[in-house]
């Protein structure tokens, strides 16, 4: 048995039904007939509502489109994995030896899913309002500055607006290579403009590498 009491202290919530928490921590590789996927589904919906309601009140004058971008910047695998890491969640997940040897305890997807499952489990046991308190505390701790300019770094859109306006060209993003083990895959992206390479970047996902390349291009153009 893992020391789940330590995790409960980090969550500031003690489960009445310990089996519910164990269920939320059980990856499908450990036991296919008993895993956290259904709780993950529930937790995803709960977090979507929690963050949506929070942003609705915090940014009372912002348009729907801006609120949607903010929510997307918070409700995603990368953000949830960051929160999960702050809880050392990887230490508590039940998974197969094969998955663990493949870096499963550090995989953002597994960490994110487990966090969602825990939120779903708390919701089942304690209700929405209590779960909202815990979820917002975790979010605000890991993202102390919930600000559109900080969270929404859409360099690709900004670059495209500039290049289309000035030269009538749309930047193209080409995958140069993908390398590294599955749990630490890296992607190298080249940003092409009018047939010439303007910038290049490497990151853990294609989207992130594209944004990084766009940022480099904007810096070269003096637009940042």
From Swiss-Prot:
What is the reaction catalyzed?
Endonucleolytic cleavage to 5'-phosphomonoester
Q: Please give the cofactor(s) recorded in the UniProt entry for this protein.
A: Mg(2+)
User: A GO CC term?
Assistant: cytoplasm
Give UniProt keywords alphabetically.
Cytoplasm, Endonuclease, Hydrolase, Magnesium, Metal-binding, mRNA processing, Nuclease, RNA-binding, rRNA processing, rRNA-binding, tRNA processing
Function description: Digests double-stranded RNA. Involved in the processing of primary rRNA transcript to yield the immediate precursors to the large and small rRNAs (23S and 16S). Processes some mRNAs, and tRNAs when they are encoded in the rRNA operon. Processes pre-crRNA and tracrRNA of type II CRISPR loci if present in the organism.
- Spell out the NCBIfam families in the cross-references: RNaseIII (TIGR02191)
Residue positions binding Mg(2+)? 40, 113, 116
- Keyword Metal-binding on entry: yes
How would you summarize the oligomeric state and partners of this protein? Homodimer.
Which positions are catalytic residues?
44, 116
> What name goes with this protein?
Ribonuclease 3
Write down the EC number: 3.1.26.3
A GO MF term: rRNA binding
Domain RNase III, which positions?
Answer: 4-127
Stored Gene3D superfamilies: 3.30.160.20, Ribonuclease III domain
Family indicated by similarity: Belongs to the ribonuclease III family.
Q: Which residues form the DRBM domain?
A: 154-223
User: What is any one GO biological process for this UniProt entry?
Assistant: rRNA processing
- Tell me where it resides: Cytoplasm
Q: Which domain of life is it from?
A: Bacteria
The record's section on Pfam families has: dsrm, Ribonucleas_3_3
């Amino acid at each position: 048995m893992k020391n789940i009491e330590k995790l409960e202290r980090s969550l500031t919530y003690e489960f009445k039904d310990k089996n519910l928490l164990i269920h939320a921590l059980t990856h499908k590789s450990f036991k296919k007939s008993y895993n956290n996927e259904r709780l993950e589904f529930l937790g995803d919906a709960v977090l979507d509502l929690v963050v949506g309601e929070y942003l609705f009140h915090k940014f009372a004058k912002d348009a729907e489109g801006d609120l949607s971008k903010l929510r997307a910047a918070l409700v995603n695998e990368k953000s949830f994995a960051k929160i999960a890491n702050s809880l050392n969640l990887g230490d508590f997940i039940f998974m197969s030896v094969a998955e663990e040897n493949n870096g499963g305890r550090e995989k953002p997807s597994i960490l994110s899913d487990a966090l969602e499952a825990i939120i779903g489990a708390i919701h089942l046991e304690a209700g929405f309002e209590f779960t909202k308190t815990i979820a917002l505390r975790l979010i605000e701790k890991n993202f102390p500055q919930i600000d559109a300019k900080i969270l929404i770094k859409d360099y690709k859109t900004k670059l495209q607006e500039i290049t289309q306006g000035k030269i009538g060209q749309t930047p193209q993003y080409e995958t140069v290579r993908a390398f590294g083990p599955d749990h630490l895959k890296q992607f190298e992206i080249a940003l092409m403009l009018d047939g010439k390479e303007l910038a290049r970047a490497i990151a853990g996902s294609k989207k992130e590498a594209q944004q990084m390349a766009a940022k480099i291009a904007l810096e070269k153009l003096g637009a940042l």
